[in-house]
Amino acid sequence: MTEISMLNDIQKIIVLDYGSQYNQLIARRIREFGVFSELKSHHITAQELRDINPIGIVLSGGPNSVYATDAFGIDPEIFELGIPILGICYGMQLITHTLGGKVVPAGQAGHREYGQSSLRLRSASALFAGTPDEQLVLMSHGDAVTEIPEGFHLVGDSNDCPYAAMENTKKRLYGIQFHPEVRHSVYGNDILKNFAISICGGRGDWSMDNFIDMQIAKIRETVGDRKVLLGLSGGVDSSVVGVLLQKAIGDQLTCIFVDHGLLRKNEGDQVMEMLGGRFGLNIIRVDASKRFLDLLAGVEDPEKKRKIIGNEFVYVFDDEASKLKGVDFLAQGTLYTDIIESGTETAQTIKSHHNVGGLPEDMQFELIEPLNTLFKDEVRALGTALGMPDEVVWRQPFPGPGLAIRVMGEITAEKLETVRESDAILREEIAKAGLERDVWQYFTVNTGVRSVGVMGDGRTYDYTIAIRAITSIDGMTADFAQLPWEVLKKISVRIVNEVDHVNRIVYDITSKPPATVEWE
């Protein structure tokens, strides 16, 4: 069987994007059940879906009202394909509105719901098989279904939602007003699994090995016999992309490792030894530290920093590519979380991402982003499946802009050194305590704040370093890590004693949301 025919044989469930910031969680949950799933635009037509030939379709949640003049719609022929369709929140309202039911502002009907609610099942349904008749679900809707379309029947309700679940088994259409993809819906995973396996007929045989086969085939088809340039940042994402690309196209890949002066301690040498030595990647190391730091001098705004770094990265690549022949593609380690935070057609921008929002319009390369449907933990699983060792796969995430976004305000050599040295101490102590796998991400930040201190018999007026340590599954949400006090004490004592120009340590105890993982 050829790679392309093997790809066509992989079962797929398509999630249509209607604007929820957590849409990819639906696809992610379905992939956990061994069924491949990915997002597509809500503009997709019935014919395009026929060509994809999915075993199921999910209509996601979203912030709009289905009755608004600018509401995101759907090709009505999609409902005639005979493919099982699950509408979630806005998706259920869209099914209702399109097929002749009634949706009204919940304030008018008194059915507005935000937060956990108790769902009561009123009739048996394959969608809810194996779940209790009463269960906690997460509701988040400002509109409500007050009349379901002809051919549908009520499956479940709640105190404030008369139609919390409905179905038309003849047409294989299902609607739920709550969000099964989030953890607050206690049996949400069971519901999505029932849809993917029992209703859609998923075999549950998709794995990261399948993803590797799919991406290799896609890369080879896209690239042909042309050449690809990859920017290595020293982080997990670009390292995994490098190994994947080498597996796909071999010596057609050239890696550019830009030392922009914003790397962690000893990072440059480690990258060369790890990826060039162990994995045999062809890496050109470029010392562009003065070039970057000169451009960043006096810049305080975090968005401007990101744009400058993103632009300059590409210009450096352009300079290096001009020395090579026939380079047409630029590969990046963009993850789905980066795309979400940078905003999409249906989702608002939280902050621009260096792999998404910092690229100049006159860029001379086509982009290849093999990881842009994956979350961080899936990237680690991909690295393991590619045979990469734990010290690479479990390396701490590191943003493309590097320490520039871990120095608040203007970047100076002195500030950079405080972060570089304090971060090294933090990583050493976390490793000594055996907490590397328990803490999802950890790093230090120069807050830009100076405070008065006493060292020896003298007064000091030096920087405050913040420690950021979080626990998370996929980076979409996170909690601050509850590090043992004795570990925090060791870290604090070492930093103030070993790092010049630092006299105070604080611990960031903010979750995401409301904060993001990085400070800038």
From Swiss-Prot:
Protein name, per record: GMP synthase [glutamine-hydrolyzing]
Domain (Glutamine amidotransferase type-1) ranges: 12-205
PANTHER family (alphabetical): GMP SYNTHASE [GLUTAMINE-HYDROLYZING], GMP SYNTHASE-RELATED
InterPro entries: Class_I_gatase-like, GATASE, GMP_synth_C, GMP_synth_GATase, GMP_synthase, GMPS_ATP_PPase_dom, NAD/GMP_synthase, Rossmann-like_a/b/a_fold
Cited function: Catalyzes the synthesis of GMP from XMP.
GO molecular function: ATP binding; GMP synthase activity
Annotated ATP binding sites: 233-239
List of catalytic residues: 89, 179, 181
Disulphide bond pairs: none
Lineage: superkingdom: Bacteria
Top EC category: ligase
Annotated keywords: ATP-binding, Glutamine amidotransferase, GMP biosynthesis, Ligase, Nucleotide-binding, Purine biosynthesis
Catalytic activity reported: XMP + L-glutamine + ATP + H2O = GMP + L-glutamate + AMP + diphosphate + 2 H(+)
